[in-house]
Design a protein with these regions (language model features):
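Short, conserved catalytic or interaction motifs in soluble domains
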Residues: 23
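Core of compact, soluble alpha-helical bundle domains
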Residues: 26-189
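C-terminal motif of bacterial Sec signal peptides marking the signal peptidase cleavage site
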Residues: 17-20
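Bacterial N-terminal signal peptides that target proteins for export
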Residues: 1-10
């Protein structure tokens, strides 16, 4: 009965139908204020979020391996064009994502898109050549922290969605991305 007592005045207040609900905004406000408030848990820290991702990826590893045994990620996402589309959108998002956009200053987005596409084509089972730097050398100067790593991963997720990738394929590449974290995160702040 207590939930109904709170819910009806709240719905009335939100919909602006106070007269139809038989009360005034003051009555609704006083009644809502008298109910105890539930304390929300604090948001997880970037370190906690990364630990959660690492645990999720470890748990998903058998399913990922089974999918890879059937067909490469490269083939399942539609090849180079699909990878390029996801990477181009990810790079575009990096340029406007507040926590990481400063890392993109002075970077040629077209060149970066081609380099990352070449890297991912090979990493996902496609054929080609990658002539870029290794992960450590490519990211050391950035002094990236976990919060920035998560921001970049969020952009990657959006890029894969933009390219039309399925949930399993997105999870697979994000888990590979999480596996590279020790090579790219070099700062704790």
């Amino acid at each position: 009965m207590k939930a109904t007592k709170i819910l009806i005045p709240t719905i009335c207040a939100l919909t602006g139908l106070l007269a139809a609900c038989g009360g005034t905004s003051d009555e609704v406000s006083q009644e809502a204020q008298s109910e105890p408030k539930v304390q929300e848990a604090p948001a997880p820290t970037p370190d906690q979020q990364v630990a959660g991702l690492e645990a999720m990826c470890a748990e998903a590893q058998p399913a990922i391996a089974a999918r890879q045994a059937e067909d490469s990620l490269f083939n399942r996402v539609g090849g180079r064009d699909s990878i390029h589309k996801a990477v181009a959108e990810t790079v575009r998002l990096h340029q406007i994502n507040e926590p990481i956009k400063h890392l993109m200053e002075g970077v040629d987005p077209a060149h970066l898109t081609e380099q990352v596409t070449d890297f991912l084509v090979l990493a996902t089972g496609g054929q080609g050549e990658y002539g870029g730097r290794n992960m450590v050398d490519a990211h050391a100067h950035m002094k990236m922290n976990n919060a920035q790593f998560l921001a970049a991963g969020g952009d990657l997720g959006k890029g894969m969605t933009f390219a039309g990738w399925g949930e399993n394929e997105k999870q697979e590449l994000l888990c590979a991305f999480v596996g590279l974290r020790p090579q790219v995160v070099t700062s704790e702040s």
